[in-house]
């Protein structure tokens, strides 16, 4: 009896340990050995994503500096406004009143170089109607007399203090010289013959310091504008003032 030899296949040990060099799924395919990634397994719930609040931005130094400056200025404005309101309620300020009472022309001469020399004496009445406010009239004032666009004379007011509810009469001498005034005298004469009066303007720029009780404030300026109609400009005669009106304005 012949013996049959059985041959069993033997696995190659190198082939058992070798890994495939090619992917199980072709390239470009969305499937792999883990299944379809686009499908969520039935036993796995989808995760909920809670949006996180963005982190707070830190204020820069410039922003803080701007805020502090703005708050300081706001408080300063409120404090100044409150102080002014308190002063107004306590002292009840009233505007001073001014009037031109007398005007005299002492010189009105046309020179050979066509310049006009003039000299005026003006009497001004200043009234302070306030009960608790005094006015210091400081140096550096200026008063001028004008006819249309021509300045005829100029001068200055004296330095003095005007007390409460006080009326002060101020006497001012003014002189001036107008260049190229050959036709100015003729124009004044024609104005007088045509209308019977001559319109003049008197301007006052006066630095003052106001005193509230015992508190003396910083310097401000009184601006006074007076329109005066006179009958003539006769030399060495008191000019008759037909009408006059003055306006007052305060400038810081």
Swiss-Prot record:
Reported tissue expression: Highly expressed in seeds and at lower level in roots and senescing leaves. Expressed in leaves and flowers.
Example of a GO cellular component annotation carried by this entry: plasma membrane
GO biological process: abscisic acid-activated signaling pathway; defense response to other organism; positive regulation of abscisic acid biosynthetic process; response to abscisic acid; response to osmotic stress; response to salt
Membrane topology field: Single-pass membrane protein
Main location: membrane
Pfam families: LEA_2
UniProt-annotated glycosylation sites, renumbered to this chain: 121, 154, 166, 180
Keywords of the record: Abscisic acid signaling pathway, Cell membrane, Cytoplasm, Glycoprotein, Membrane, Stress response, Transmembrane, Transmembrane helix
Triggers of expression: Induced by abscisic acid (ABA), osmotic shock and drought stress. Slightly induced by salt stress.
Region of interest: Disordered: 1-46
Disruption phenotype: No visible phenotype under normal growth conditions, but mutant seeds show decreased sensitivity to abscisic acid (ABA) during germination.
Subcellular location: Cell membrane; Cytoplasm, Cytosol
Residue ranges of the TM segments: 70-90
Assembly: Homodimer.
Main function: Plays an important role in the abiotic stresses-induced abscisic acid (ABA) signaling and biosynthesis. Acts as a positive regulator of ABA-mediated seed germination inhibition. Functions downstream of ABF2/AREB1, ABF4/AREB2 and ABF3.
Entry-linked PANTHER family: LATE EMBRYOGENESIS ABUNDANT (LEA) HYDROXYPROLINE-RICH GLYCOPROTEIN FAMILY, NDR1_HIN1-LIKE PROTEIN 6
Protein name as annotated: NDR1/HIN1-like protein 6
Protein species of origin: Arabidopsis thaliana
Source organism phylogeny: Eukaryota, Viridiplantae, Streptophyta, Embryophyta, Tracheophyta
Originating gene: NHL6
